[in-house]
UniProtKB/Swiss-Prot annotation:
Keywords: Cell cycle, Cell division, Cell inner membrane, Cell membrane, Coiled coil, Membrane, Transmembrane, Transmembrane helix
Pfam families to which the protein is assigned, alphabetical: DivIC (PF04977)
Protein name per the record: Cell division protein FtsB
Compartments reported by the entry: Cell inner membrane
Function recorded in the entry: Essential cell division protein. May link together the upstream cell division proteins, which are predominantly cytoplasmic, with the downstream cell division proteins, which are predominantly periplasmic.
Organism: Dechloromonas aromatica (strain RCB)
Mode of membrane association: Single-pass type II membrane protein
Periplasmic compartment segments: 22-94
Length: 94
């Protein structure tokens, strides 16, 4: 009877090994699930960035407001009849 119990436990162990550690085992499934969640997070961030870029491209194609804003802030341009005034920041200690 003792050998039968040991034999059955060994058989159960041999049957469980591929389930947990084998090629399609639970450990692999959990690892793939973790990788999938990470990739979904990366994809979500990229979709948000792409939506912002898409909105900016549409804005640049349709109107001059975005172009004017970029010219003013990034290139320091002013309109023809405007006067540019720059006020220097106060230096601490003076």
């Amino acid at each position: 009877m003792r050998w039968l119990t040991v034999g059955l436990l060994a058989a159960i162990g041999l049957l469980q090994y591929p389930l947990w550690v084998g090629k399609g085992g639970w450990l692999k499934v959990w690892e793939y699930d973790r990788q999938l969640q990470q990739q979904k997070e990366v994809t979500r961030k990229l979709e948000i960035r792409n939506a912002g870029l898409d909105a900016e491209v549409r804005d640049l194609k349709q109107g001059y407001d975005a172009i004017e804003e970029r010219a003013r802030f990034e290139l320091g341009m002013v309109k023809q009849d405007e006067t540019f005034v720059q006020i220097p920041e106060k230096v601490p200690g003076k």
